[in-house]
Each structure stands twice: as C-alpha cells, then as structure tokens.
Curated annotation (Swiss-Prot):
One of its GO terms (biological process) is isopentenyl diphosphate biosynthetic process, methylerythritol 4-phosphate pathway. NCBIfam families: ispF (TIGR00151). PROSITE patterns: ISPF (PS01350). Binds 1 divalent metal cation per subunit. InterPro entries: MECDP_synthase (IPR003526), MECDP_synthase_CS (IPR020555), MECDP_synthase_sf (IPR036571). Signal peptide: none annotated. Homotrimer. This is 2-C-methyl-D-erythritol 2,4-cyclodiphosphate synthase. The record marks 37, 136 as: Transition state stabilizer. Its cofactor is a divalent metal cation. A divalent metal cation binds at residues 9, 11, 45. Gene3D superfamilies: 2-C-methyl-D-erythritol 2,4-cyclodiphosphate synthase (3.30.1330.50). GO terms for molecular function: 2-C-methyl-D-erythritol 2,4-cyclodiphosphate synthase activity; metal ion binding.
Length: 161
C-alpha cells in the first residue's frame, strides 16, 4: 500500500542578523531570517506535515503547538524526527520527496546541493529520491514583495510488508 502526503508552510521573512536562516536543516548565509515560534525551517515543516498528512495524523501544530512556550525556538529537526517516528510506528517507509521553495530570496540554486544532502541524512534517503527546487511569484503578492517565503512538499510512503 502507498500513501501520498502534501505539506505546505510559509513564514515571514525579515532582515535579522541575530537569527539564522535555516532551510532544510542547514544554516544559510543571509541577512534574512524567517520569523516563527520554532526555528521556522519551512522545508522541514512542509516535509513533516506531508508525513502526518499521508498517515492521516493531523498536522505539526497538533504535536508542537505555537502556544507552548517550552517549544519556543525548537529545532525543526526535532519536529521531523517525531514525524518519522510516527511513520515507523505505522510501518511505513519514505520512498521519495519533492519540495518546491517559493519566494524571491534567498536564491535556492546555490544552496540546493547542501539542502539535498542534509535532507538525505535526516531522512535516510538516497540523493536521487530527493528533489529540491525553487520558483518565484514573478514579484506578485506578499512573496513577490519579499515579505516571506514558502515551501510545498509532496511525499510518497510505502507500507512495509
């Protein structure tokens, strides 16, 4: 049996030299940072939500509510690990992921290899089962005005026999 999951996450982007910009589990050199209750890693959030969605287990807000002060600035890798544990408990394995980052900045092309390698390590997936790509909104809307960035992620899970 196979299951497909989709995850979407958006965060506000601001100039902040005191907070790192984290995408796909890596720190990116940038004057920008994402605003959020956690470290605001939109890629790991979208993957985590896609896993939960494929398993019909809700969303990351149910497991890691932004109203819980103890979760302030939580590393999104912790969120992902919890979702992977839930996936294993349900006897599913991750087959592949396809992520698209949407926004004007930062440019993803120079970061793509590092992000893909990070995801390969975090997810225990071969590099050829991970797609990370980017697009813009052609300067339209909030993302086009560089007020934020987002990620869409689709995943495929396979039930272990």
């Amino acid at each position: 049996m196979y299951r497909i999951g989709n995850g979407i996450d958006f965060h506000k982007l601001e100039i902040n030299l005191n907070r790192p910009l984290i995408l796909g589990g890596i720190e990116c050199e940038s004057e920008f940072a994402l605003v959020g209750h956690s470290d605001a890693d939109i890629i790991l959030h979208a993957i985590s939500d896609a896993i939960l969605g494929a398993l019909a287990l809700g969303d990351i807000g149910q497991y890691f509510p932004d109203t819980d002060p103890s979760l302030k600035n939580i590393d999104s890798k912790i969120i992902l690990v919890k979702c992977l544990e839930l996936m294993k408990e349900k006897n599913f394995d991750l087959v592949n992921i396809d992520c698209t980052v949407i926004g004007e900045r930062p440019k993803i092309a120079p970061l793509k290899d590092r992000i893909t390698k990070s995801l390969s390590n975090l997810l225990n997936l071969p590099l050829d089962c991970i797609s990370v790509k980017a697009t813009t909104t052609e300067k339209m809307g909030a993302l086009g005005r560089q007020e934020g960035i987002g990620t869409f992620c689709s995943i495929l899970l396979e039930k272990r026999s």
